């Protein structure tokens, strides 16, 4: 399945990383909406209905964990694919979000934009 035109919501408070990810995703033909905090991200997830969400864990207003719990508790957003971007590589942090049904977990210090974009494309192509 083609990924061009698929909608990705990028929720990340680090402006540099947000812009770098956005540019890389747009180069692959994806429609990218961005949010700089968890509250805005949750609002956009509900109104824009993205095909996939890239979600930072530590953000102002609402944490990524709070956003993820709200997404999974809402019938309209329950099934959306979510990839986590986090500074934490602690197993308990990974397990906590994994139990909420994520499609992947990336540690920012090891982040490769190529690898991230490849994973996003893979997940979006897998949609039926």
Outline where the language-model segments fall.
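Non-catalytic signal-transmission and effector/linker regions of two-component phosphorelay proteins
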Residues: 1-7, 114-128
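Conserved acidic carboxylate
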Residues: 12
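Charged docking surfaces used in two-component/phosphorelay signaling
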Residues: 19-23, 27
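Acidic catalytic/metal-coordinating carboxylates
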Residues: 37-40, 63-69
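Active-site beta3 strand of CheY-like receiver
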Residues: 48-54
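Active-site residues of response regulator receiver
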Residues: 56, 86
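Receiver (REC) domain active-site loop signature in two-component systems and cognate sites
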Residues: 59
